[in-house]
Curated annotation (Swiss-Prot):
The keyword Oxidoreductase does not apply. Trimethylamine N-oxide binds at residues 55, 102, 131, 177, 222. Part of the ABC transporter complex TmoXWV involved in trimethylamine N-oxide (TMAO) import. Is specific for TMAO and essential for TMAO metabolism. Binds TMAO with high affinity. In vitro, also presents a high binding affinity for choline, however this transporter seems specific for TMAO and the choline-binding affinity presented by recombinant TmoX may not make physiological sense. It comes from Ruegeria pomeroyi (strain ATCC 700808 / DSM 15171 / DSS-3) (Silicibacter pomeroyi). One of its GO terms (molecular function) is transmembrane transporter activity. Can alternate between open and closed states for binding TMAO. GO terms for cellular component: ATP-binding cassette (ABC) transporter complex; periplasmic space. It is found in: Periplasm. Ca(2+) binds at residues 249, 251, 254, 257, 260. This is Trimethylamine N-oxide-binding protein.
Length: 333
């Protein structure tokens, strides 16, 4: 029996509102249940609570894993949560797991929760992440010194708008992603004004609007996602990330400021879980420890929603049907 309660995602972008979860095709479901011995073992009948945030890969990945759990006979519930506060929710057991712990955006919140206890590190995905200031390649024509951040600052006037006056405009991620763009601008003495996008969709809209006339833009971006295949571009190279850059002013080029360096260029993408998950849902937890996605797989998940305009649950079903050779070994152990 399936128990499912859905709370719609609040992303105003192309992800839209999530529809009711759909089951796999009968053939696929039968194959999973027949070949997966985990399905016969008893996990708790209480639902595993999976959080939904405001970017597409996380929403689709959550649906992918949720559908796998449901086909194992485990109930699943999706809830919309803040992407920073979720680690406290996992720690307290209000949310069961988190599938995309990005080092640059959420590492600090994750570490703080680990120190308090109640949350466990369930391991890394194969994916390597980067999150930072980024520009499409046509921007380099207007600012040929890129990707050096000093060259970007020298070109600030190229990025000025009516909104920012004589300062360059940088479109950062949503406020809850805590990217500290304003602190970096101040720490490095940059002639830029930081504007926060309301959603991931607003970032893609900014790039798309600039593409027609090849207007130079600099925005927050990350990898993996679909954008790298649609708009070739580069990350701005800031002073290299050093541990402590966000905590100790002595670390980094400005001895009086924090956040005076770039984000990690080879960041982790982790999974986290409530420490009680293994005892309450041992079979599902065992599968979670084996789940690992690559950069191309995560980019494809985002593309199904952001480019192909599928609903997240439909995108998850399509991804699972096309990648049975990837996820079946997670079930078989």
């Amino acid at each position: 029996m399936r128990l499912f309660r859905e709370i719609a995602a609040n992303d105003p972008g192309p992800t839209g509102r999530m529809k009711n979860m759909k089951t796999f095709t009968t053939a696929l479901a039968t194959g999973v249940l027949a070949l997966c011995p985990l399905a016969a073992l008893a996990d708790s009948s209480d639902p595993i609570v999976i959080p939904i945030h405001n970017w597409s890969s996380q929403i689709v990945m959550s649906n992918v894993v949720g559908q796998i759990f449901e086909e194992m006979g485990v109930a699943v519930e999706f809830v919309t949560t803040d992407s920073q506060a979720v680690y406290e929710s996992v720690r307290l057991g209000d949310v069961t797991l988190e599938l995309e712990v990005w080092e640059g955006a959420f590492g600090a919140s994750f570490r703080a929760a680990l120190e308090k206890g109640g949350i466990v590190d369930v391991g890394d995905h194969d994916a390597v992440t980067r999150e930072d200031w980024w520009y499409p390649m046509w921007t380099k024509d207007a600012c040929p010194g890129l990707p050096d951040w000093k060259a970007l600052n020298d070109c600030a006037a190229v990025f000025a708008t009516a909104e920012t006056g004589d300062k360059g405009r940088y479109l950062d991620g949503p406020v809850d992603w805590l990217k500290h763009g304003k602190e970096r601008v101040e720490a490095l003495g940059m002639n830029f004004e930081v504007i926060n996008a309301g959603s991931a969709a607003a970032l893609w809209a900014e790039i798309g609007a600039a593409e027609a006339d090849k207007r130079p833009v600099v925005v927050f971006n990350w990898t993996p996602n679909f954008a790298e295949a649609v708009w070739p571009g580069e990350f701005v190279e800031f002073p290299e990330w050093v541990d402590g850059c966000d905590k100790d002013p002595a670390v980094g080029p400005n001895p009086d400021a924090l956040y005076d360096c770039g984000n990690p260029a080879t960041g982790y993408l982790k999974k986290a879980a409530w420490e009680g998950m293994e005892a309450k849902w041992p079979d599902a937890y065992a599968v979670l420890t084996r789940i690992s996605f690559t950069n191309p797989q995560i980019a494809e998940m985002a593309k199904l929603v952001d480019v192909d305009e599928m609903e997240p649950d439909e995108a998850a079903e399509a991804w699972l049907e096309a990648n049975e050779d990837v996820w079946r070994p997670w079930l078989d152990g």
